[in-house]
C-alpha cells in the first residue's frame, strides 16, 4: 500500500493537466504518461541499480580474516586442557588478508562496469518498447475513432434517405421497392456502426493498458521521422543488447585469464605463553598451480568460447535488424504509393460521383437509391483510405520507435 500510493499519486499528477482541460491527448503526451507508469521500465531500472551497486565493490579487496586459536594444548596427562601449565601452549590471535593485484582488480571493475552498461541498455529497451507499443495503440485508437465518424455519417445518410423515401411513398411519388432497399441499407449501416464500435472498444482497452485513461478525442499523430538503415541497425534493441553481452563476455574472459596468477595471502599472528616470551608469527600463503593447462587454461578457453558465441550472436542480430528495416521501409514506401493512387483513382472519383448523384436527385432525374449508393461508395472509399493510412502509420512507428534513444525514463 505504501509503495503503490506514491506511484498512483505521480500518475495522477501526470494526468492532471489533461483531465483539467479535457483537451485532445497528443501522441507525445501519451508516450510520456506510458513511460512514467511502465512497470517493465521500473523493473529494468531496478536491475540497473543492482548492477551499479554491485560494481562499487568489484575492485575491493576481500575482507580480512580474524584468526583465533590455541596451539599445543595438552590433550592427555594431568595437564590436559590446561592452557597455563605447559610452556609450549600458546594462545594465538592473528589476521590474514588475501591480496589481489591492481591488474586483477582493474579487470574485475571493467567486468562490473560492462554489466552496468548492459543493464542500462535494458532500461532503454524497456522504455523504447513501451513507447512503441503505446504509439501503436494510439494509432489504432485514433483511426478507430475516425472510422466510427464515417460509420455514423453513413448511418445518418441512410436514415435521411429512408425518411425521404417514406415521404415520397406517402405522396405517391416513390415506390415500395425503393423504401425497402433503403430500409435494408439503414440496417446494414447500423450493423457496420456496431462493428466499428466493437473495434473502437478493443482499441480503447489496448490504449488504456499503456496510458491508463481513454480520452474522448485524440490528436492526429502527425508526421513521423524515420531513421536511416545504419541508425536503425545500430540502435536496434537486440543489436545493442548483443553488443553489451559481447563486452561483458570479453571482460569476464579477462578476469578468468587473470586467475592464472594465484592470489597471495599474508598473515600475522600474536602468541601468548605462560612463563615464557610471547611470540609473533608472520607468513605468506602462495597457491601452487600444479596443472594450469588442465584447470586455469581450460576455464579461460571456456570463457573465450562464450566471447566467440557473443560475436556470432551479434552478427546474426545485425543481419536480422537490417532485413527488418528493409522490409518495413519497403512496406512503408508501397503503402505511400497505394495511398496516393487510391486517393487519386478512388476517393476523388467517389466524391465526384456523389456530387453528380446529388445534382441528379435534386433535378428530379435520379433516385434515392442511386444517391445512397454513391454516398455509401464514397464513405467506403474514405474508410479504405483510413485503413491504408493507419497501416502506413503503424509501419512508420515500427521504424521510428523500435530503435533505442538517448532518453531514459526517470
Predicted segment positions?
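A glycine-/polar-enriched beta->alpha junction
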Residues: 32-42, 49-64, 93-110, 121-128, ...
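Bacterial N-terminal signal peptides
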Residues: 9-18
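Transmembrane beta-strand segments that form the barrel wall of outer-membrane beta-barrel proteins
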Residues: 65-74, 262-272
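Periplasmic alpha-helical coiled-coil/stalk elements that build and connect Gram-negative outer-membrane
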Residues: 2, 25, 126-237, 328-335, ...
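Bacterial Sec-pathway N-terminal export signals of envelope proteins
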Residues: 21-70, 75, 98-99, 107, ...
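Residues that define the transmembrane beta-barrel architecture of outer-membrane proteins
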Residues: 87-91, 276-280
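Solvent-exposed loop/turn segments connecting transmembrane beta-strands
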Residues: 79, 271-279
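Acidic, low-complexity, intrinsically disordered peripheral segments
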Residues: 1-3, 76, 384-410
Amino acid at each position: 500500500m505504501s509503495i503503490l500510493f506514491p506511484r498512483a499519486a505521480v500518475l495522477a499528477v501526470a494526468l492532471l493537466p489533461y483531465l483539467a482541460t479535457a483537451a485532445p491527448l497528443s501522441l507525445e503526451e501519451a508516450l510520456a504518461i506510458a513511460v512514467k507508469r511502465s512497470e517493465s521500465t521500473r523493473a529494468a531500472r531496478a536491475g540497473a541499480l543492482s548492477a551499479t551497486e554491485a560494481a562499487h565493490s568489484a575492485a575491493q579487496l576481500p575482507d580480512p580474516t580474524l584468526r583465533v586459536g590455541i596451539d599445543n594444548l595438552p590433550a592427555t596427562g594431568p595437564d590436559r586442557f590446561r592452557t597455563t601449565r605447559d610452556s609450549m601452549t600458546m594462545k594465538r590471535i592473528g589476521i590474514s588478508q588475501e591480496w589481489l593485484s591492481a591488474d586483477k582488480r582493474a579487470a574485475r571493475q571493467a567486468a562490473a562496469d560492462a554489466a552496468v552498461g548492459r543493464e542500462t541498455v535494458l532500461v532503454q529497451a524497456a522504455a523504447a518498447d513501451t513507447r512503441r507499443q503505446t504509439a501503436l495503440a494510439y494509432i489504432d485508437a485514433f483511426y478507430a475513432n475516425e472510422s466510427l465518424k464515417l460509420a455514423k455519417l453513413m448511418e445518418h445518410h441512410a436514415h435521411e434517405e429512408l425518411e425521404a423515401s417514406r415521404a415520397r411513398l406517402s405522396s405517391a411519388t416513390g415506390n415500395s421497392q425503393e423504401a425497402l432497399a433503403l430500409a435494408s441499407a439503414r440496417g446494414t449501416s447500423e450493423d457496420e456502426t456496431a462493428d466499428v464500435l466493437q473495434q473502437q472498444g478493443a482499441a480503447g482497452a489496448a490504449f488504456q493498458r499503456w496510458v491508463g485513461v481513454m480520452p474522448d478525442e485524440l490528436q492526429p499523430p502527425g508526421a513521423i521521422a524515420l531513421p536511416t538503415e545504419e541508425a536503425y541497425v545500430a540502435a536496434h534493441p537486440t543489436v545493442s543488447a548483443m553488443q553489451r553481452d559481447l563486452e561483458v563476455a570479453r571482460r569476464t574472459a579477462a578476469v578468468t585469464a587473470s586467475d592464472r596468477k594465484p592470489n597471495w595471502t599474508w598473515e600475522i599472528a600474536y602468541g601468548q605463553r605462560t612463563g615464557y616470551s610471547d611470540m609473533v608469527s608472520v607468513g605468506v600463503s602462495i597457491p601452487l598451480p600444479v596443472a594450469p593447462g588442465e584447470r586455469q587454461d581450460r576455464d579461460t578457453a571456456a570463457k573465450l568460447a562464450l566471447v566467440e558465441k557473443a560475436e556470432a550472436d551479434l552478427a546474426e542480430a545485425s543481419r536480422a535488424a537490417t532485413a527488418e528495416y528493409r522490409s518495413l521501409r519497403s512496406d512503408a514506401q508501397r503503402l505511400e504509393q497505394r495511398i496516393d493512387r487510391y486517393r487519386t483513382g478512388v476517393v476523388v472519383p467517389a466524391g465526384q460521383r456523389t456530387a453528380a448523384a446529388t445534382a441528379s436527385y435534386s433535378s428530379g432525374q435520379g433516385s434515392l437509391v442511386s444517391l445512397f449508393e454513391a454516398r455509401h461508395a464514397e464513405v467506403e472509399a474514405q474508410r479504405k483510405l483510413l485503413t491504408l493510412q493507419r497501416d502506413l502509420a503503424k509501419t512508420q512507428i515500427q521504424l521510428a520507435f523500435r530503435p533505442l534513444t538517448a532518453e531514459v525514463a526517470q
